[in-house]
């Protein structure tokens, strides 16, 4: 069984499935699976790394504690390719923080977007943390924002900024925040509250 994020498309008979699998280091494999024993019948596609010939940003993932002091939050740092930890870099926090979305994933490049890669190539540190209220961590994790928008998830993002300020290469005087949709709400709220 391949490690990574799997998305299955089941055949009408239920006997076979197409398995789209991706991991931090594998862009995409597409396999035909026999459902009864989960055996790979055929690999239909094994996508090569499209960035293999390029000097790409480094992606680091890890955990910080939420504002409640006990919940582990997943984060992703996208770092300039030639990061020098003795220098200070401007940093952008990309935030969503709302329901039904997970930004730090176990698939290709841990879910880093083209924007993250682009900005890191230009000398920015890019940071994302999935605060409480985001998807795929269970009901209790997701429901802390129910009828309580802009409180717990904001406090978690502030914990993320505190973590960033502890890193030797982050310029604490040049940290920006960016988001769209619920992330736009979070961005505005963070700017006006903190």
Features from the language model and the residues they span:
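Serine-hydrolase catalytic core recognition
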Residues: 5-194
